[in-house]
Amino acid sequence: MEALMHLSGDPQHAFRSIHITGTNGKGSTATMVARLLQAQGLRVGRYSSPHLSSITERIEINGEPVSEELFAEEVLALAAVADMSEYPASYFELLTAAAYRIFAVEGVEVAVVEVGVLGRFDATNVIEADVAVLTNIGTDHTDQQGDWRRNIAGEKVGISKANSVLVVGETDPDLRDIFESEPSASLLFAETDFELTDDQPAVDGRLLGFRTPRGLYDDVFVRAHGSHQAQNALLALTATEEFLDAALPDDVVAEAFGELTLSGRAEVVATEPTILLDGAHNPEAAQALKETLDVAFAVSEPRVFVLGALEPRDPADFIENVGIGPGDYVVAAAVDSPRSIEPARIADAAEAAGATAETATNVDQAVDRAKVLAGLEGIVIVTGSLYAVGEARSQLA
């Protein structure tokens, strides 16, 4: 990756950056940071993965995906550059290099960059970020054998640099020595250096209070569902303050958080019936979805789940984590992937949990059927994978 960047003129040095890693919450935190910076009047790039509907979603400037023409132009140019290198470039390396080139050419002042996998050896880690953020350490990308949490933490914290501020959302005290062993100008820990002072469900989101190293913020409405999003907002606010070296004006925070859209993350895209999209891509994310449904959508009945999942996910485990059971409906669908789990297998697992289940040929068909089952007062939850969410979002959003 370094060779590819050097042959491209090292565009990653043309802008400042905030680098975000962690098992869950990377995308939401990155979106929140980008919105806070944009509300401050900065020209902001955001690089994320994976995408839901279009690959251009991965590279945004001021909240808008880059054009297909610009995306194709830069990827093709970089593919030609990569051919001159003795080291072949991977798909993700080409996309990352294209993002950095686009940010440089388009005059981005700060890029918010989401790690692809882990961190230390990730393609994104050629930037010298001003602020590094580690959201948490969960069970994704690991077989959970041996000292896996310490190993994963050591890889993720590898995005920290000697002159950067490291903002840590993970609160396990047994991992603190790993974070402290990495080079950084300063370390900030959740629950010690910054914390939530209030967290209440509200209509269309949550009402939060924050204590950060630079100030107190009270009665902040965040347009996002779930207590996990409160933690992401806290991390985003702290990281943004550290980047700017100042507290943020209350009106900037209110604007950024109050107008937030988190695509595919407890995202409500329709009413009558309510239709909610959430990828819930690992056990922790599935449990977070359960909490969101139990708290923010408890009065919505019946609940109809459109489930489309990929191997090697265990449908029974997912159904248990999300809390699907008696009284719920499940419409199981195939997604557009060779790894798609057979809908009948998902339906069998749902029925074993006490739900009423049926199958559909694809996600579009499943959503149409789910809307009928839900009626005007119910809720349709599209989940199980980002593939299912992306296909539904293309139909609905």
Annotate each predicted stretch with a short phrase:
Residues R16, I20, S28-G45:
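A conserved segment at the C-terminal end of the G1
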Residues T23, V44, V112, T135, ...:
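Residue-level signal for inorganic ion chemistry
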Residues P173-I178, E182-S186, D204-R206, E241, ...:
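C-terminal helical cap/extension that packs against the catalytic core
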